[in-house]
Amino acid sequence: YKWYNILYTKYESDMGLDYLFKYAHSLKGIGNYKRSKRLLKLYNRKLAGEEVEQQTKHNEIVLDGLLRMEEKFDINNLSINSKYSEFSPMYYGGDQMVYASAKDSSIFNTRRYKWNNQPYLDLFVAKVNDETQDFKNALKFSKKINTKYHEASVAFSPDNETMYFTRNNYGKKLKRDKNGINHLKIYRSRKVNGEWLEAEEVSFNSDEYSTGHPALSPDGKQLYFVSDMPGSIGETDIFVVDVLEDGSFSSPRNLGPEINTEHKEMFPFINDKKLYFSSDGHVGLGGLDVFEVAFDNLKIKKEFNNS
């Protein structure tokens, strides 16, 4: 919010469209909905004409409805949280949870990620405390999985013998594209005799774009993920591939404009009836909000061949 406010103070209506959109969303995030509405109207006037104006009016009605909703959930801070980032929890084996954390558990001088000055993310596992429904005894996940760069966003097969997760494009060294960007990739590991094997990247990865945030359908036959690959509608879209009998994958399919916007869709999660995801492109309260859609309403675009 602070830096977007400085930009707007300096440039006002000449502020770039992308920055104007993000500034409006940051205002939502701090509860300044009145000013956010005004800036979103300015954003839409600059972006297009009457059709967008009608959409803006509809969005305001939806937002007003959200603000009038009664709270339905109690939110508790778990004991495994630290002063660093913790996110992307996933149940594992019935009584454990695997999650990503930048928690510094080393006695040595830990390498830090320059973007946020926090240690690199690793996967941790914690046990469920049946009495309190909290989590305890958090430990780092397998040494075969965690590296000196980022690992996060894990998904497990129904039998817990296969896992997918997000990692920097890192083999023996950090790989970059032609513009010098190190992308994210999805990796897969299988468990043999109770031990996780060295992970291998999935076939639809590329050195030229990112894939991440894997999520498996309950039967393990579809893998949903996030990417900015060619054919994306926005900054990051949600895609799906079929997991075939031999372990290979179909070509990625975009979930389409009912789900994906020109902005960011991220962190998909699937149960038997609904897809849940985060977005800053749909109408919400600011930043990334959580949305849901019933499977019956999904209209998935044709396959995209990235070979």
Predicted regions and their residues:
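Residues that mark the junctions of alpha-helical repeat units in TPR/alpha-solenoid scaffolds
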Residues: M15-G16
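Structural marker of alpha-solenoid helical repeat scaffolds
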Residues: K10-E12, K46
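Alpha-helical solenoid repeat scaffolds, predominantly canonical TPR units
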Residues: W3-Y4, L39
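Canonical positions in the second alpha-helix
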Residues: I6-Y8, Y43
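Short, conserved micro-motifs composed of acidic
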Residues: Y19, G29, Y33-R35, L39-S307
